[in-house]
């Protein structure tokens, strides 16, 4: 469960459940301190976000303890996923720049 308490983001969930009819499809939503929306990312979905404002504060509520070793990263600008992040010149982390494309992703779900 994610929520923005300051600023705003575009938040994205990608279905990575191999047997799902919506496998590879994504849903995006704007979360902001003004709209106070929360977004549930269920198991079997990849999660990403792009901050739309400086000094954005983003909170997470997790169902399990965070396990960095299990984290895998999809390429943020993957052509197959075709996600509109709503930003023209994003600042992208090295980890996200070196992620794998969806076509080569092997899902654990």
Model-found features: residue ranges?
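Conserved SET/PR-domain catalytic core that frames the SAM/AdoMet-binding pocket
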Residues: 32-49
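Active-site region of the double-stranded beta-helix
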Residues: 1-34, 52-109
